[in-house]
Amino acid sequence: MKSLLKWLLKIGLIALAFYLVFKKVSWESIKETLQQFSLWWLIPAFILYNLSQFLSAYRLLHMFRSVGVNIPYVRNLQLYYKSMFYGLFLPGGVSGDAYKVIYLQKRSEASYKTLITATLLDRVNGLTTLLSIAALLLIQRLDVLQEYVPVKAWWIIILLIIGWLVYFLLHRKLFPAFNGVLFKITAFSWVIQCLQLLSFFCLLKGFAIVAEQWISYGILFYGGSVMSALPLSINGLGIREWVLVTGSGLMMIDSAKAFSASFLFTLISGVCALIGGIIQIRSQVAGREVANNSQ
């Protein structure tokens, strides 16, 4: 009952987000914008997004191996895509991360606490990097921020340096088991976020948006990514779109194109999650065949 309530709340939030979006931008303008999209740009966008997932799985593998979970990369990659599928469709506590933890705990000597810690630290590292890139992009559009706060570019840079120093010190003190891979996974996180940003830029190119505006779209894209990382909806659906459309006025960009690019990115991530579902079905079928042959 509790899981059903959470599921219904997420659906309600998605509906609210889209309601607010369509109050700001008409469906006709979105439809017209999508019709103008060059479909060829979906190919590099899809490839770049999947490359980011391959590297994300490799980053997480380093965290697991730090606590003695020696799983082959290919199996971990399959597990990563399966968890994307479960995270997309299963409500409540049965999330993608929970699936990874349960799966590995049954096949290793690591405790639930250790595996949960590794998974959460992996996410925190990625989120910290995401916020850092968003801040660096924001420096390019300080004119927008300075309308509300008299901020300087060097203030943001200093805050980033201090923030990363604090992050590294706390991480090394509180989670010494992962000290050996801390800098490596951080480097992975920067590459992963850049790959996802490039994937989004491919979608912008498909809408023939001039490169001079990509930074503005990118800032809102990262803002939406931060919001969609929260367990508020299904795969961030509606949340990222709401952020881009709401912020489009501040950034002086086309709200219909902002929504459409964000929606296509969400669609790509959803398709990748479905790939995880196919992998899961194939593994279940193979498992049944092995069981039948052994009888």
What are these regions (language model features)?
Residues 67-72, 104-115, 249-256:
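Juxtamembrane helix-boundary/capping and inter-helix hinge elements in multi-pass membrane proteins
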Residues 73-107, 114, 228-233:
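Hydrophobic alpha-helical transmembrane segments of multi-pass membrane transport proteins
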Residues 102-105, 201, 245-246:
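A cross-family signal for key residues in well-ordered alpha-helices
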Residues 103-143:
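Hydrophobic alpha-helical segments and helix pairs
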